[in-house]
C-alpha cells in the first residue's frame, strides 16, 4: 500500500506559457489528472516538503506513514525536517509558513496510516532510493544559501547506510 496518487502539475520555471495547456489537456484525456501552474517552483517545494519530511523517515524507521503521525518522537523528527526544508524554501522563493508545512505533512501521514513510500520500499528491497534527489536537493539548496540542515544530512547518511546494508 503505497502512499497515494495525486494530480500532475506542469509549469515552466520562468512563468507560464500557452504551450502547457495542450499538454495538460492530453494528460487529462488519458485519465491522468493534470493542471498547469504559473509558479511551478512553489509547487515543487510544496511536494518536496512531504517527501523530505515524511518519506525519508518511513525509510529510516521502516514504518508506514501513520507511525510518523502517531509516535511523538517520529513526529518531532518530521517537524524538524519540515522546518529545515521550509527555511531553505523561503530562502529560495519565500512565502512558506513552517507551522502550516508541518500541519500539511502531518495530515498526509494521518490520512494514509498504512501507506508506505517509495523510499521505504527501495530501502527494504535493497534498491537505491531517490533520497539524493529529494533530501539531497534540500541539502544542496541549503548549501547555496548557507542554511544548516543537520537533520537532512543525518537522514541521507542513514538511508545510504541502510541501502548498503540491505544490498549486502
Language-model segments: residues:
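Internal alpha-helical scaffold of NAD(P)-dependent oxidoreductase catalytic cores
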Residues: 1-52, 57-98
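NAD(P)-dependent Rossmann-like dehydrogenase/reductase catalytic/cofactor-binding core
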Residues: 28-29, 79-168
Amino acid at each position: 500500500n503505497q502512499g497515494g496518487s495525486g494530480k500532475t502539475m506542469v509549469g515552466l520555471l520562468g512563468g507560464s506559457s500557452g504551450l502547457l495547456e495542450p499538454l495538460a489537456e492530453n494528460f487529462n484525456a488519458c485519465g491522468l489528472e493534470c493542471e498547469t501552474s504559473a509558479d511551478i517552483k512553489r509547487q515543487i517545494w510544496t511536494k518536496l516538503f512531504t517527501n523530505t519530511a515524511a518519506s525519508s523517515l518511513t525509510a529510516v524507521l521502516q514504518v508506514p506513514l501513520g507511525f510518523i503521525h502517531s509516535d511523538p518522537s517520529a513526529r518531532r523528527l518530521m517537524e524538524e525536517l519540515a522546518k529545515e526544508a521550509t527555511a531553505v524554501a523561503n530562502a529560495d522563493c519565500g512565502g512558506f509558513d513552517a507551522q502550516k508545512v508541518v500541519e500539511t505533512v502531518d495530515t498526509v501521514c494521518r490520512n494514509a496510516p498504512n501507506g508506505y513510500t517509495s523510499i521505504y520500499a527501495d530501502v527494504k528491497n535493497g534498491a537505491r532510493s531517490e533520497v539524493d534527489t529529494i533530501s539531497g536537493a534540500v541539502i544542496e539548496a541549503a548549501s547555496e544559501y548557507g542554511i544548516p540542515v543537520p537533520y537532512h544530512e543525518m537522514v541521507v547518511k542513514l538511508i545510504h547506510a541502510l541501502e548498503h546494508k540491505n544490498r549486502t
